[in-house]
């Protein structure tokens, strides 16, 4: 693994590159909320061993890019612009793929209205359509008008503890993985599981609503191949039901 700088419209982003000797394709990976690019090292080395050139970076407010304000993404538009600029840095002569996990899947679904990759792998994506989720979204948006930068433990617990309650067991953050070792490592990792700002929750919620609009889906390339994946117990994707809904669109 090597590192390179990609100069975006916002800043110079430190991008990790996994480069095989004879790459057959290129892939950009977009990670999820309250985690960082390093969690995907094993997966990207696996792809590298199978001759796929991979790049990954930390979203704004995450990992190496917390800028002293970890958990604050700024805006979802910034996340999508960064993803577009890093995507454009992929080798031009290779088929291009993008994989987005959880919050990264929302970034990807917005990004797909502006790019035409060979393939898109959408992992654990979600919607917010239940009456309770609509109430929670309205509540968060209201609080964001007054305290956008606050990292409310109550709201963070409302979001993530609610996910935990849908999964058997007692470990904190058990909703993130069926593999107990993954959960333990996540909880030990100082760059994972951190609170995010109310503004970040608002931005994510609004983006989830936006990705289902015809303005976005109507601009997807008909030549892009899709692979939709979800854990059957994943609470963010409503136990995989949101993947089925997306497949039907």
What are these regions (language model features)?
Residues 1-19:
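N-terminal cap/lid segment of alpha/beta-hydrolase-fold proteins
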Residues 99-104, 108:
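Gly/Ala-rich beta-loop-alpha elbow adjacent to hydrolase catalytic centers
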Residues 108-191:
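Alpha/beta-hydrolase-fold enzymes
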Residues 228-230:
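Short beta-strand/loop motif that positions the catalytic acidic residue
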Residues 73-91:
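Alpha/beta-hydrolase active-site loop
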Residues 24-32:
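Short beta-strand element of the alpha/beta-hydrolase
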Residues 32-35, 102, 232-233:
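Active-site glycine-rich loops that stabilize anionic/oxyanionic intermediates
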Residues 37-68:
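Conserved alpha/beta-hydrolase
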């Amino acid at each position: 693994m090597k590192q390179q700088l990609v100069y975006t419209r916002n800043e110079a982003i430190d991008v990790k590159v996994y480069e095989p000797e004879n790459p057959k394709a290129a892939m950009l990976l977009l990670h999820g909320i309250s985690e960082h690019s390093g969690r995907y090292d094993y997966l990207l080395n696996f792809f590298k061993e199978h001759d796929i050139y991979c790049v990954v970076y930390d979203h704004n407010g995450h990992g190496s890019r917390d800028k002293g304000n970890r958990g604050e993404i700024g805006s979802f538009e910034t996340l999508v612009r960064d993803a577009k600029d890093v995507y454009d840095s992929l080798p031009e002569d290779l088929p291009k793929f993008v994989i987005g996990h959880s919050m990264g899947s929302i970034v990807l679904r917005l990004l797909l209205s502006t790019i035409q990759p060979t393939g898109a792998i959408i992992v654990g994506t979600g919607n917010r359509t239940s009456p309770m989720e609509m109430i929670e979204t309205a509540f968060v948006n209201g609080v964001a008008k007054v305290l956008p930068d606050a990292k409310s433990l109550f709201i963070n617990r409302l979001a993530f503890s609610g996910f935990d309650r849908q999964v058997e067991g007692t470990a904190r953050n058990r909703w993130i993985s069926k593999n107990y070792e993954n959960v333990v490592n996540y909880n030990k990792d100082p760059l994972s599981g951190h609170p995010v700002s109310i503004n970040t929750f608002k931005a994510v919620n609004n983006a989830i609503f936006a990705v289902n609009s015809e303005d976005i889906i109507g601009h997807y390339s008909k030549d892009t191949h899709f692979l939709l994946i979800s854990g059957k117990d994943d609470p963010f994707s409503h136990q995989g039901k949101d993947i089925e809904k997306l497949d039907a669109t």
